[in-house]
């Protein structure tokens, strides 16, 4: 990604201190289990290690480390029974979920030959799970439980831990980067309008405002021909251009992409919401004509660029890009009642990483429908198979909500006028999907990603403390 972020995950383990002097062999046993457990965390996150906690004081020290690091998530390994005072001081002042990992070392007891230290050390991780949840509830903390086994391996446990770490990346990205708003939202699309101060207070995402006048001149100082030529080739490698593409044909576009990439790094931008409604003449017209592919080049590098000034869908695109590797702006395009499928897509910038069925294409159109000017239009070709849609909306009090649906993209004819579109079948049927999705009150834009990601989105929502409306799976 152009702007890298790395989630910070607080990790610690707990055990009842009274056991250790009674059964000293538990000390190396627990140290080994905890060391092995930490290896399960992917290297995509920064581990903040709170150690093995057996006293309230150790728990408070772990909490100090977690607060100082501003952790995005806490993962707690239950080694054996422990009282909740080993846990609660570490998380009391945090506003992130606590994932309780109840992973038993042995798959099953050897009933006749199990002594007390063997039971306590290898078979008793489940002893305090309910107690921990009870006290997390009373403390108003969000929580989750993962149960599994070490012996023989447990891919489900590994997958859940990695999924939580992916979800934690979203919080870190929202906190450590900025959103660029260029211009203003499309006039009259009031569902897109947003209070940027409320956005920061609720989601920790800061909005930087930019005028188009600055953007028109952004490429004026880009003169390194080797850099421009390399970026032009990158554009040609990304898109098939109608009528053929050459380095010379996309030279000016490449200059803008290079400039935008540097701007994104300088301003630490991971989200862009833009809309231009001027006269599209002179330098303004030049940039407007090639903005769609230029922003598409940013999207494939992890910068969510949303048209029509839609900040909320930029967030949705970034979430899906972060957890799945692709995030494509979409909206309801049509319903094929004969086939009982929804046609979903959008014009404008898109994510080359979703275009797995065919190389993205680019062509010149005389007019951008509903907008100022004309120029390059890009089309992307999502593959047949599972697809996830994510919309973000707000209630009357400014609280955010996620709206999610999973479906299946099917083969068949699509529109050919240059916009990305896909044929999605939903388990509830096209008619009912449209009713349910609309009744959930989303903005008219949504983000799309290949695969099924509802479970990960639910984790993201728990981390961000946002409700979720699952429309269909």
Language-model segment annotations:
Residues 231-323:
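Long, internal scaffold/assembly segments composed of regular secondary structure
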